[in-house]
């Protein structure tokens, strides 16, 4: 049934942000109104709708200034249930689909698939229109069809413990949701461009986005990635994330340590016989009840000690990182940086991130570029913690995609968005200056930081940036209705 479409209560900053072949589907039934679209094991259930004014109001609730974000369409949301392989079975999982409502349905939309961050409660998944799920309305409001997988063990799947930071299942949940979109009759009759698939995610979603990009490039040639932008993800679990975590006397989220161990045990089956082999009592005996899919992360963290020596069994940390140990083998299996992207890839990070250490992005960038990647960048968004970094990374990726994509104008089959004719700022990232328009042009522009504060204005073709702090900025061309992301790096 449809949810109440009253505005969700949105905090003022982004929060901390883990068979059968679907091509064999032969029949589908399209129903209208509050009905459900069925395609064998797939269903598309209406879960919400926002017209253009409501999307604009939602952007204001998220603190997105109109100078940086101007949607062009209303959006309808659907919960998708679809099949994917997991371990030795085919399982039914869920995800969210956000479709533009005011664009010509025969004009193919670009597709943005967003991989969500760490959650513990199943109903916090995107298809329940949770806080992070609300981002789908904003992303789709720019003219994209947006997909958000819930992942295994979350959303409608109550048969599994969520396999946290498990690259294979993260990637499969995204790839099979994309496949469901392209192989099923669309609930609104919209068309989609398989050559414009953009991938992003933040935190665990950054890890999942990297895994999905790798999976699509390697095994799904029919769905080439146009660009991807993972944010603050643990790409190098063996080389960065766990060594940095274990080197400190405390960790900001002890729930993550337990989540990882329990999840990997559920997948690999050889890490331990009992959680008490890794964790001290009384905590070890409490973990099954805490990770029940209904207990929020803050409550789990409050139940566990932040000092690692009070939580993890003595000597276990050294053992976990020993080559050949089951935990170390599982860690290596879930590293997602040792491959060579063929499409442009940006990794956004912040240097004060206390949850996912920024060296993950630097190690991934170094490996990829040293081994032949030509369009990979690690982008420093500044000295922000994990929560404050999220908005810049998620919004920056969204507008970076928007600057590259061909987006349909509202209700037009012939006219395309001007974004395919935009002068792309260069160099970008910039240090001392950035050129934002051709030398002969004299369009008025304003430069804004990620909070929407105006920093400069003018008509010159170059902007001096040497006095600006590192981070994400946007140049706004009011007359053309364009907002282009610029990264200042040092």
Q: PLM features: residue spans?
A:
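Short, surface-exposed "cap/lid" segments of acyl-processing enzymes
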Residues: 87-90, 101-138
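C-terminal catalytic histidine-bearing segment of alpha/beta-hydrolase fold enzymes
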Residues: 323, 328-329, 355, 362-363, ...
């Amino acid at each position: 049934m449809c949810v109440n479409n009253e505005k969700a209560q949105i905090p003022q900053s982004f929060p901390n942000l883990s068979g059968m072949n679907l091509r064999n589907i032969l029949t589908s039934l399209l129903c209208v109104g509050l009905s459900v679209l069925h395609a064998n094991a797939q269903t598309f259930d209406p879960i919400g709708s926002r017209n253009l004014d409501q999307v604009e109001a939602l952007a204001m609730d998220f603190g997105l200034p109109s100078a940086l974000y101007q949607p062009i369409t209303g959006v309808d949301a659907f919960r998708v249930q679809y099949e994917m392989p997991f371990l030795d079975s085919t399982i039914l999982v869920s995800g969210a689909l956000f479709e533009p409502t005011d664009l010509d349905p025969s004009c193919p939309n670009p597709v943005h698939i967003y991989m969500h961050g760490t959650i513990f409660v199943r109903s916090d998944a995107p298809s329940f229109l949770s806080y992070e799920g609300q981002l789908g309305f904003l992303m789709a409001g720019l003219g994209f069809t947006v997909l958000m997988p819930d992942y295994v063990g979350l959303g409608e799947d109550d048969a599994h413990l969520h396999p946290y930071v498990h690259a294979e299942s993260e990637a499969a949940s995204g790839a099979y949701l994309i496949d469901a979109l392209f192989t099923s009759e669309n609930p609104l009759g919209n068309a989609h461009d398989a050559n414009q698939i953009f991938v992003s995610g933040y935190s665990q979603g950054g890890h999942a986005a990297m895994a999905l990009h790798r999976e699509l490039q390697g095994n799904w040639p029919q769905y080439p990635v146009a660009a991807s932008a993972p944010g603050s993800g643990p790409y190098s679990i063996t080389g960065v994330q766990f060594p940095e975590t274990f080197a400190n006397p405390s960790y900001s989220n002890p729930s993550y340590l337990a989540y990882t161990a329990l999840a990997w045990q559920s997948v690999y089956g050889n890490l331990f016989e009992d959680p008490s082999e890794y964790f001290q009592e009384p905590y070890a005996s409490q973990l099954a009840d805490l990770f029940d899919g209904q207990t929020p992360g803050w409550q789990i963290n409050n139940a566990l000690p932040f000092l690692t020596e009070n939580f993890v069994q003595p000597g276990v940390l050294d053992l976990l990182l020993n080559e050949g140990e089951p935990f170390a083998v599982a860690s290596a299996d879930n590293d997602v940086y040792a491959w060579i992207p063929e499409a442009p890839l940006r990794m956004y990070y912040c240097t004060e991130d206390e949850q996912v250490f920024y060296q993950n992005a630097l190690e991934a960038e170094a490996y990829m570029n040293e081994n032949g990647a030509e369009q990979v960048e690690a982008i420093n968004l500044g000295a922000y913690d994990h929560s404050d970094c999220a908005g810049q990374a998620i919004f920056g990726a969204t507008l970076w995609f928007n600057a590259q994509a061909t987006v349909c104008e509202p209700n037009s089959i012939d006219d395309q968005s001007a974004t395919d004719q935009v002068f792309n700022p260069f160099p970008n990232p910039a240090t001392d200056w950035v050129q934002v328009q051709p030398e002969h042009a004299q369009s008025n522009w304003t430069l804004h930081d990620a909070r929407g504060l105006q920093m400069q204005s003018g008509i010159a073709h170059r902007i001096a940036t040497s006095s600006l702090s590192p981070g994400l900025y946007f140049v706004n061309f009011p007359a053309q209705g364009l907002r282009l992301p610029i990264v200042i790096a040092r």
